[in-house]
Amino acid sequence: MAKRILLLIVITAFTIASNACSKRTETQNNMTTTKSDPINISSFKVRTMDGQEKSLSDFKGKVLIIVNVASKCGYTPQYDGLEKIYEKYKDKGFEILAFPCNDFGGQEPGTNEEIQSFCKTNYNVSFTLFDKIKVLGNDKSPLYSNLINYDPAGDISWNFEKFLIDKDGNVVGRYKSKVKPESEELTTAIEKLL
């Protein structure tokens, strides 16, 4: 009997200690935040669709959504929601940085010109589209190699995964593809940062 009580006490103490050491805070089902050191994107340089190098430090002072996009994906209609929130918040210091990628089922096979034309014709996209990149594998872009370390760390799971960036360039949220851009969850988080 005494051994059982002692074993129960040890298991309970271990469980409490394990939970206390956890740095994660769960928020709904789609996003996890962490209290670890922030991941900052300001030092990264990316290419615009016309091949010009652009420093992400140019966006300091703005709230950002960084999103990997594709034209032939079940989530492609999210371009519409992205454009809606861009139009709603752009005058308050908000930008969307969209990075086409062809890593998931070949769903973005087009050239930069074809992608721009598709987005303008079908969704009247006016936010910034960047050069097509890789978000998976050994040759993934340096930006995404950094972004995927935000808790819950791990590779991008599909197109239209979103990262929320504060005005200082710190990653403060990660939203899976199923979270719509105009969802209350995402727009509330954006509004808190503006």
Residue ranges and their predicted role:
Residues M1-M31:
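Bacterial Sec-dependent N-terminal signal peptides
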